């Protein structure tokens, strides 16, 4: 299973996270987010992540210039579009930066199937998150049954995922490729090493130091 930990803000948290056999680590560049990091900060933090782990910048309705800066000034190699971006934005990014992984986050609402079809040619991976006017970050789960209709594209489940919720999700036998976790590896708004370790050991089936 693909495991992405997201919303990192400190060097110590990153140094611990990259030891946990995760597949991707996310940095949020969105001023309205409590986990927002500037491009200068992302430049420093992303350089702490080894090449074996995707370095993901999470953006919401970015300008072309923001994308250009993130991909020229930092060690980012994946862009997660988490807003209302159109296909043209994703296509532009994919064409200009063919080696960059394109991720599209979508809300788990009644438009989900339609929007997956809309973006599937441009997106390498989808993230399905709890609907919110603030574009995610709620820490709340959604009705996972809506995922039954997703059959032909890879997607990660987001929305307050913890070890216990992952176990509940697994019982449904859906086709998720993995999980995108931010609040589920935090305690009182800060990254919790024990939660990171617990989830990665459960998902990857390996004991980490």
Swiss-Prot record:
**In the record, what terms sit under GO molecular function?**
phosphoribosylanthranilate isomerase activity
Q: Which family does it belong to?
A: Belongs to the TrpF family.
UniProt keyword terms in alphabetical order = Amino-acid biosynthesis, Aromatic amino acid biosynthesis, Isomerase, Tryptophan biosynthesis
InterPro entries given in the database record: Aldolase_TIM, PRAI_dom, RibuloseP-bd_barrel, TrpF_fam
Superkingdom of source: Bacteria
Q: Which Gene3D superfamilies match?
A: Aldolase class I
Q: EC number(s)? A: 5.3.1.24
Q: Report the protein name in the record.
A: N-(5'-phosphoribosyl)anthranilate isomerase
Gene Ontology BP annotations = L-tryptophan biosynthetic process
Gene this protein is translated from: trpF
Reactions catalysed according to its record? N-(5-phospho-beta-D-ribosyl)anthranilate = 1-(2-carboxyphenylamino)-1-deoxy-D-ribulose 5-phosphate
Q: In which pathway does it act?
A: Amino-acid biosynthesis; L-tryptophan biosynthesis; L-tryptophan from chorismate: step 3/5
């Amino acid at each position: 299973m693909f495991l992405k930990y997201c919303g990192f803000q400190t060097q110590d948290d990153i140094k611990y996270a990259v030891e946990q056999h995760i597949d991707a680590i996310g940095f949020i560049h969105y001023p309205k987010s409590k986990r927002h990091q500037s491009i200068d900060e992302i430049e420093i933090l992303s350089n702490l992540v080894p090449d074996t782990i995707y370095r993901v910048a999470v953006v919401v309705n970015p300008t072309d210039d923001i994308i250009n800066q993130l991909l020229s000034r930092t060690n980012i190699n994946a862009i997660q579009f988490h807003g209302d971006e159109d296909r043209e934005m994703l296509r532009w990014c994919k064409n200009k930066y063919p080696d960059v992984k394109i991720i599209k986050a979508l809300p788990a609402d009644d438009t989900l199937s339609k929007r997956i079809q809309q973006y599937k040619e441009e997106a390498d991976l989808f993230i399905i998150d709890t609907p919110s006017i603030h574009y995610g970050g709620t820490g709340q789960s959604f009705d996972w049954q809506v995922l039954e209709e997703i059959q032909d594209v890879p997607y990660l489940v987001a929305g307050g995922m913890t070890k216990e919720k992952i176990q509940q999700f697994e019982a449904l036998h859906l086709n998720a490729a993995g999980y995108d976790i931010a609040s589920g590896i935090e305690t009182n708004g800060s990254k919790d090493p024990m939660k990171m370790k617990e989830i990665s050991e459960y998902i990857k089936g390996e004991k980490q130091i």
